[in-house]
């Protein structure tokens, strides 16, 4: 049964590819001027079969498309000529902006609009990838300004708003989901936000969905940074509702991003450690993160009555690596710890004051190699990043307490991946 389904899907994909090839060939014959290398290039990314749709949006009744990230040299006449390649156009409107323009194209037939999304999304016009999607009014989305938002990281490139919403739809108060898209490349930025009407549902979603598979990747969930919203409803000067897309951009070309998120802010150097057992002490937590060897530890705090603690590092990259390595750790006092970013940045100008190595446990004791390893950590904190890298390479194979090998190199190349970690709020 499963094999038959796969065969059917492959056949549908082949038919779709053949149909697209036929359409593109016809477009080149009808509009050869558009395919001059300096004007319009072939597709540079896979087309969206149905656009990046909001929850509940019905494309079967839509005949309008949004075109974003349009090169400033494109005129309204040229835009109309480009989109007319997929079918007769009822109207075309180009709104010019300083950096990139946007526009709306209304077709007589929705099939022509669908084909425009499939064949023109990602096409390079004057070297700039154009974004094409279904156009719809903001009124089609629920107002989520007072809802509870969670951050979802490590998303697969193919995950759309609809797919993300579907993954969280089991939670009754889930109200919206949006994937953030890169304004320049038209590709997913690998993270998004999900809204909930009920705070408890949001917390439950974080607990249950963190680490679950969505498409081809395990996602990471946590509370969104304060101020990270989907954007307020906007209205144009004529009182009409402004069209806003689900791919993280509005019709004014602004990208709805989370630039101040801790994974993007070098001022964040503190790791939040949750799900701690009541018997875990500050010394226990210090020992654990010391053995990880992620970097120079400056402060360790534990709230035993609340089941969490904080570990502050010398640099942002060290903290990012500690989050990644900490989440891969086995149990600490019979519990799997959960690591993410602390909720406050380290104040500018904070002097570096590394903690000394933690007091040795009765078994095993800290060896001379452990102390040497910590001295190397202190040296790393004072060196140029390139020199740090060289020293890390030279430090391969150094063992520390608990048998952790290659403490300076293990997983360090994956710091960028660790930057998708999330924010915690008390």
Curated annotation (Swiss-Prot):
Single GO term (MF): mRNA binding
Location in the cell: Nucleus
Major site of localization recorded for this protein: nucleus
Coiled coil: none
Record key words, sorted: mRNA processing, Nucleus, Phosphoprotein, Repeat, RNA-binding
Domain called RRM: residue spans: 63-137, 148-226, 269-344
UniProt xrefs under Pfam families: RRM_1
InterPro entries documented for this protein: Nucleotide-bd_a/b_plait_sf, RBD_domain_sf, RBM42_RBP45_47-like, RRM_dom
Gene Ontology annotations of biological process type: mRNA processing
CDD domains listed in its UniProt record: RRM1_PUB1, RRM2_PUB1
Phosphoserine found at: 250
Self-association and partners: Interacts with UBA1A and UBA2A.
Protein role: Heterogeneous nuclear ribonucleoprotein (hnRNP)-like protein that acts as a component of the pre-mRNA processing machinery. Functions to facilitate the nuclear maturation of plant pre-mRNAs.
Name of the featured protein: Oligouridylate-binding protein 1A
UniProt organism field: Arabidopsis thaliana
High-level lineage: Eukaryota, Viridiplantae, Streptophyta, Embryophyta, Tracheophyta
């Amino acid at each position: 049964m499963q094999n038959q389904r796969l065969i059917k899907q492959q056949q549908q994909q082949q038919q779709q590819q053949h149909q697209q090839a036929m359409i593109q060939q016809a477009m080149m014959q009808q509009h050869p001027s558009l395919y001059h290398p300096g004007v319009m290039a072939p597709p540079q990314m896979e087309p969206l079969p149905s656009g990046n749709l909001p929850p509940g949006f019905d494309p079967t009744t839509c005949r309008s498309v949004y075109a974003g990230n349009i090169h400033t040299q494109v005129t309204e006449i040229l835009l109309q000529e480009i989109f007319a390649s997929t079918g007769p156009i009822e109207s075309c409107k180009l709104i010019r902006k300083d950096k990139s323009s946007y526009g709306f194209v209304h077709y007589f037939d929705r099939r022509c609009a669908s084909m425009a999304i499939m064949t023109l999304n990602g096409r390079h016009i004057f070297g700039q990838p154009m974004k094409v999607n279904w156009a719809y009014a903001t009124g089609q989305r629920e107002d989520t300004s007072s809802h509870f938002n969670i951050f979802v990281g490590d998303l697969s490139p193919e995950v759309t708003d609809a797919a993300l919403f579907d993954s969280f739809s089991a939670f009754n108060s889930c109200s919206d989901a949006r994937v953030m898209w890169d304004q320049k490349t038209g590709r997913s930025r690998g993270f998004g936000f999900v809204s909930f009407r009920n705070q408890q549902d949001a917390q439950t979603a974080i607990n249950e969905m963190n680490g679950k598979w969505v498409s081809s990747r395990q996602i990471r969930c946590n509370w969104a940074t304060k101020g990270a919203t989907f954007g307020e409803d906007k209205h144009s000067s004529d009182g009409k509702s402004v069209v806003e897309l689900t791919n993280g951009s509005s019709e004014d070309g602004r990208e709805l991003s989370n630039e101040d998120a801790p994974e993007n802010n070098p001022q964040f150097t503190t790791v939040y450690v949750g799900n701690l057992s009541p018997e875990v002490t500050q010394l226990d937590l210090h020992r654990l993160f010391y053995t990880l060897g992620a970097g120079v530890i400056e402060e360790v705090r534990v709230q035993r009555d609340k089941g969490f603690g904080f570990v502050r590092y010398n640099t942002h990259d060290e903290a990012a690596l500690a989050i990644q390595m900490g989440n891969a750790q086995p149990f600490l006092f019979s519990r799997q710890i959960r690591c993410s970013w602390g909720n406050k940045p380290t104040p500018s100008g904070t002097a570096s004051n590394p903690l000394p190595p933690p007091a040795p446990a009765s078994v095993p004791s800290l060896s001379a190699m452990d102390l040497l390893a910590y001295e190397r950590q202190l040296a790393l904190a004072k060196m140029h990043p390139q020199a740090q890298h060289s020293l890390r390479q030279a430090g391969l194979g150094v063992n520390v307490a608990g048998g952790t090998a290659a403490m300076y190199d293990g997983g360090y190349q994956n710091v960028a991946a660790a930057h998708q970690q999330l924010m915690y709020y008390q």
